[in-house]
Amino acid sequence: MRRPFPITLPLLVVALLVSAPLSAHAEDPTKHPLSEKKRKMMTSAWQQQVKELTEQIKQQPDRVGFYSRRADTYFFLAQFDKSVADYQKMVELDKKLDTSHWRRGIAWFYAKDFKQAAHQFEIYDNFDNVDRENGIWRFFSQARAYGLKKARQGLLKYKKDDREPFPSVYKL
């Protein structure tokens, strides 16, 4: 099962920017790829979105979609514990989301709850066993939670080809 592109790409971009800012200028790896003005504008927009979604949640506390959008927004703001809490609320409201909730695994990873992240990616494999990106996240989580040796032993096996660059990355 493929993830919706509009959610996957922004989450990947934010994950990369949050974990290790990349530089457009190789000569200055400390320079952030986005201007300070652009970062402030994005942060302000996300903060406003959190306020609006919080009000919507007060009005309709059982709407899973509001928690989903607010959790994503908290993730973009690098407020990973709040992101996890909203993803957890989604699962509380709709138990069917538990297995398929890969975003919760990424939020747990950045919240430094590596065991929970590894578990989420493990159960996600039962939902979608051809998603090599999930296997990479699981490996990262297991390496942080249990060590590199156990993570290597726990590598998921894939029988079906996946989109590049994931097969190549997985071979590393």
Language-model features: locations:
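Start-of-helix register in tetratricopeptide repeats
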Residues: 65, 99, 133-135, 140
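Register position in tetratricopeptide repeats
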Residues: 76, 110-111, 144
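Residue-level recognition of tetratricopeptide repeat
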Residues: 38, 72, 106, 140-142
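Canonical positions in the second alpha-helix
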Residues: 55-56, 89-90, 123-124, 158
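N-terminal leader/linker segments that initiate helical-solenoid repeat arrays
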Residues: 24-65, 69, 76
